[in-house]
Amino acid sequence: MKMHCARLPRQGVYEILEESTDMNKAYIEEKMSELPIVQYDWIDTAELVFTDRVRMICQTECPMYNKTWACPPAVGTVEECRERCLRYDHALMFTTMVEVRDIANIEETLATRHDHEEVTRQVAELVREQCGDVLVLSTEACAICEHCAWPDAPCRHPDRMFPCVESHGILATDIAERHGIEFIGGNVVTWFSLVFYQ
């Protein structure tokens, strides 16, 4: 699959958002065009939907629940996560995509995540250069360490560990659909990240 970086069209409030921040978005967008980002957009964090239903899926269906610092309950309650995210007025959301032979093969699918996490790290660095403090949410559970220190000791790599978007109770499909971000389906995996900034 050919990867391309597509800026979604801005409407109304997003043009105001771009003017209201000191960040050099053109510089970030230029640098992002060198990465395998498929789609991205700048959003207002007030648009995000936080729900306990998403957290319930983590708790009842995800085998990583209560096993890493990137997952519940280590990340806090949904309300604590909401407050943490809304300390930032803006976020950059973006996706990468990769084609796999069988999307039902979880091992094959998860093996593609490392590249997205590296892209996320690079994008977070670009935003951090412009804004200072950022909060990064990305995909699935953290897999940096073979055995996570949770719950016995602090995270060994807090600067590299990105909690999962859904772990914070964020309804990723809602914000993605409202901004025209596509989840293609079939055997195409869409990885999704948010970089919050002020």
Residue ranges and their predicted role:
Residues 10-22:
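Short, Lys/Arg-enriched N-terminal segments with co-localized hydrophobic residues
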Residues 21-27, 103-104:
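Short, conserved charged micro-motifs
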Residues 26-41:
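N-terminal domain-onset segments
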Residues 38-68, 72-198:
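Catalytic cores of enzyme domains
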